[in-house]
């Protein structure tokens, strides 16, 4: 199956966040695969405007909804199918591409609650959007 059209111009990895939650998705399959028990909550929260997303290319997206999509991702989708995961891709209300310092500050603010002020300041001081997202991705892996 093909990649959902809403993700064709998104540069991965991406950071998806809302108040009290952040998640780094390394690829479209990681972003669009949801445990069956959580997909309705994710869809409700996105409709209420709680989710934002940032990509490694420096774009900030306001997530409008997570819409069900056909499974994609080649052989990896089989594992998700066996785990009874649901595929849902984000649609966007709007997107913008702020300058790098503003972008990095937004990302720092987004992860402050999860990783603390010191790390948020480190992310905000990143020189490029790619660097900011990679810092969060590394910390996310360590945190588990």
Residue ranges, per PLM feature:
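Solvent-exposed, charged interface segments at domain starts and junctions
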Residues: 1-2, 144
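Short, extreme N-terminal segment that most often corresponds to the first beta-strand
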Residues: 2-27
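Low-complexity intrinsically disordered segments
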Residues: 46-144
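Compositionally biased amphipathic helical and low-complexity segments enriched in hydrophobic
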Residues: 4, 8, 17, 32, ...
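Short, flexible N-terminal segments of the mature chain
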Residues: 22-57
């Amino acid at each position: 199956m093909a990649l959902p059209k809403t993700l064709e111009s998104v540069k991965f990895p991406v950071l998806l966040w809302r108040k009290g939650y952040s998640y780094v998705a390394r690829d479209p399959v990681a972003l669009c695969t949801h445990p069956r028990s959580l997909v309705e909550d994710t869809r409700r929260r996105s409709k209420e405007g709680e989710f934002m997303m940032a990509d490694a290319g420096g774009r900030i997206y306001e997530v409008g909804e997570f819409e069900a999509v056909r499974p994609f991702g080649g052989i990896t989708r089989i594992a998700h199918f066996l785990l009874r995961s649901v595929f849902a891709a984000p649609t966007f209300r709007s997107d913008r591409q702020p300058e790098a310092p503003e972008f990095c500050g937004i990302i720092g603010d987004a992860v402050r609650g999860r990783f603390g002020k010191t790390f948020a300041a480190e992310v905000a001081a990143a020189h490029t959007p790619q660097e900011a997202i990679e810092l969060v991705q590394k910390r996310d892996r360590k945190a588990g």
